[in-house]
């Protein structure tokens, strides 16, 4: 039997307002940090912010295809507000990631998300290098459709 109806990815680019999302979800301190993150991610990716799903502020996009054949689109870089924490999307581990993480400051790293409470706890130059490394690695892995 042929399975033609692929499951649709939940996280897709939308027309929702980035500013409205931040206004609704962020504390005052988080709002200031979001402003800095937005400038950093726009500078690194050379893309304007777009909402991806209901809760990710994403920049740029790339198309991926798994060995299973499932494919989709995702932002090259992004961030989200998760309660009292901010998270930055680092989809791909660049060559320098482990060394950079050791110099970053107070954070937790998940599979593809970097969690922290405030930018003041982090070395922002290192954070920018982490994002740039992840974006470069995504473009290297997906050269035919890197969203550039």
Spans of model-derived segments:
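Charge-dense, helix-prone N-terminal extensions
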Residues: 1-148
């Amino acid at each position: 039997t042929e399975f033609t109806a692929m499951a649709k990815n939940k996280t897709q680019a939308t027309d929702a307002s980035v500013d409205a999302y931040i206004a609704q979800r962020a504390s005052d301190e988080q709002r200031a940090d979001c402003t800095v993150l937005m400038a950093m991610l726009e500078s690194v990716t050379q893309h304007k912010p777009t909402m991806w799903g209901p809760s990710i502020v994403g920049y740029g996009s790339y198309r991926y295809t798994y060995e299973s054949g499932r494919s989709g689109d995702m932002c090259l870089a992004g961030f989200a507000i998760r309660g009292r924490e901010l998270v930055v999307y680092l989809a791909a581990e660049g060559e320098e990631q482990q060394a950079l993480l050791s110099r970053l400051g107070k954070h937790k790293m998940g599979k593809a998300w970097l969690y922290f409470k405030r930018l003041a706890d982090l070395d922002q130059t290192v954070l920018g290098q982490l994002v740039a490394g992840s974006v470069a690695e995504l473009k290297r892995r997906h050269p035919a459709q890197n969203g550039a």
